[in-house]
Amino acid sequence: SILKQELPLGKIIRLKYNRQVHKNEKGSILNFNMKQQTQNNPLGTEAVSGLMVKFAIPSIVAMLVGALYNIVDQLFIGQAVGTLGNAATNIAFPLTTSCLALALLFGIGGASCFNLTMGEGNREKAAYYIGNAVSMLFLCGLALCLITQFFLNSLLKFFGAPQDVLPYAQEYVRITALGFPFLLLTTGGGHLIRADGNPRMTMICNLTGAIINTVLDALFVMVFQMGMAGAALATVIGQVISAVIVICYLYHF
C-alpha cells in the first residue's frame, strides 16, 4: 500500500526520531511536552471509561468547531453579499467534502498503522507511518487544488451553479482551493494526533483556526468590504494556522 512506501517527509520524521532516541540513550531529557506525549500514550495504560470521556468530549467539540467555518462564512457573506453569495458557498461545498474524504482516508489509515506499530513497541516504524500519512495528505490536497484551479468552471457547472451564481462561486473557490492542502493536513493530522493520545491538541488546532476565521471574516468582509474574496481569504488563513500547529506537533515525534 501507499503507506508502506517511505515518502520524503516520512524519512525526515524517522531520522529525527532516531536522533532523539540516540540522545535519550545518553541520558538527555526531552524538554517538550509534545515529545513526552508521544512517549506516554494513554491508550495502552489508562482505564477505558476514563479514555471514553477524555477522547469523546474534545472530539465532539473539534467536529462542531470544524462546522463553524462554513456557518461563519454564510453569516458574513449573507450580510455583505446577499443570497447569491450564500448560494456560491453551497455550490463549492462538494469540494470541501472531497477534502474531508481524503483526510479520513489517510488520517485514519495512518493512525491505524501508527497504533498497531506502537502496540508492537516499534516506535521508529510508527514515526515512519506518521510521516508518510502527512506526506500523502499534503500531496493529495495539492493535487485537488491544482485540479480545481484548472477545471474550475467545469466543476462548478457540474455542481449545478447557475449563471448568476457562477461569478461569486469562482471568486470564492479560486481562493479557498489554495487552502485544500492545509485543510487536509488539519483534518487528517487531527486523527494522527488523537492516535498519539492527545485529543485535546486536535481540539485546540480546530478551535484556533475557527476563531481566527471568525475574526478575519468580520474584518475582511464587514470592515474592508472584500466580499467573497475576504471570506475565502479568512478561511484559508485559519486553515493555514491550524495546519502549522498540527505539523509542529507531529514534527516532534
Regions found by a protein language model. Name each.
Residues 73, 110, 151-152, 189, ...:
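Hydrophobic/aromatic residues in alpha-helical transmembrane segments
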Residues 68-71, 80-83, 117-120, 195-196, ...:
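Helix-loop interface residues and adjacent transmembrane-helix termini in multi-pass membrane transporters
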Residues 86-146, 183-202:
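Small-residue-rich hydrophobic transmembrane alpha-helices
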Residues 98-101, 213-217, 243-247:
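Hydrophobic transmembrane alpha-helices of multi-pass small-molecule transporters
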Residues 49-68, 72, 95-102, 178, ...:
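Residue-level signal for short hydrophobic patches within transmembrane helices
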Residues 3, 11-56, 114-181, 223-253:
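Short alpha-helical transmembrane segments in multi-pass integral membrane proteins
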Residues 124, 137, 192-218, 229, ...:
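Alpha-helical transmembrane segments of multi-pass membrane transporters/permeases
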